[in-house]
Amino acid sequence: MALQIDGERHLMRLTLGALAELEAGLEEGSLVELVRRFEEGRCSTRDVLALIVAGLRGGGWDGTAKDLLSAEIAGGPMAAARAAAELLARAFMLPEES
């Protein structure tokens, strides 16, 4: 999936390394608790930012969360929240059986 930041399209994916980095940086709990917060609609902007950074890093981006604080994300904060939720859902989706 992709997100447009400051007019530039960036690919995002949650690789195993990106997930490990995300979990290590979480201030509140584990990935399971992060998933639960999203499912229950209790995610914070900090959760959204952490997921977007992890997805971008998994897609090859070299930036940091600080780089995104003043960035313009196409679609605004709601688009960022939707992208974060979709990243999380895709990361834990079971592969389709062939």
Predicted segments, located by residue:
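A short, sequence-level motif marking secondary-structure junctions
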Residues: 14-19
